[in-house]
Amino acid sequence: MYNGNVFQSGGNVVATAIYNVAAGTWTAGPTPPAGLDQADGPSALEPNGKVLAMYSPGLFNTNCAFMEYDPSSNSLSYTSPGVASNPACPQDSSYYGHMMVIPTGQIMFTDFGTSPVAVYNPVPGVVAGVAPTILASSNTLAIGSTNNVLYGTNLNGLSQGGFYGDDYQGDTNFPLVRLTSQSTGNVYYALTHDESTHSIKPGIIMYTKFDLPATIPAGLYSLQSVANGIGSNSFVVSVH
């Protein structure tokens, strides 16, 4: 988590656990209610620092529930409006689900059943000090150009973003480049590649290369680096 601790949740109907990385110690976390557990299941770290997790009762049983862990109060609570807050419930078990933190800061949910794709909207907010920071980038970019370079810190984010277990990982610890038109507000994404590192250690200076779409209109744009749904400071660029 962004506070430097690890939130552990598993398949036993017991308390969750918190691992303090700096101290090397474990403490008990909250116990999920109603016999819920995560005998395989997805979780995602929200930009606000909370953890969204999918639970279900017992081993591979259906009737799932979605809960948030709040590290500030060491508590688990159902997502609003309640247990059936996702169209996948009640027919899903937790192991059906997958979560991914998307660039908007929302959490996208899919399963391998027939449920529609769902998007969870976390409470707005970003934990202080975790956002990417752009240090340098070209301020003039050609339409369709390739191998442009952006330098910054925290460009990979400070977390994997999404988690599951041994069967699946929805990692988003890599930089995206987002361009927002200052005249229309339309949003475009560049193709990023060849990052200098995939480290999520705070403060590391790194770079990523990016290719502009051939279809992006000319004009002034606010350029941001995005990781795990968290955008950086804006950098004004001219696209021609």
Where are the regions that the model predicts?
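Edge beta-strands of extracellular beta-sandwich domains
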Residues: 231-240
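Beta-propeller and closely related beta-sheet repeat lectin domains
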Residues: 39-43, 96-99
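Beta-propeller blade signature
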Residues: 15-23, 64-73, 117-122
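Immunoglobulin-like IPT/TIG beta-sandwich domains and homologous Ig-like subdomains
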Residues: 3, 26-28, 36, 52-56, ...
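Proline-enriched interdomain boundary motifs that mark the N-terminal boundary
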Residues: 26-28, 126-137
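Residue-level detector of Asp-centered blade-edge/turn motifs that repeat once per structural unit
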Residues: 1-4, 45-48, 101-104
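Blade-level signature of beta-propeller repeat domains, shared across WD40, Kelch, NHL, RCC1
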Residues: 93-130, 153
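Conserved beta-propeller blade signature
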Residues: 6-8, 51-53, 106-109
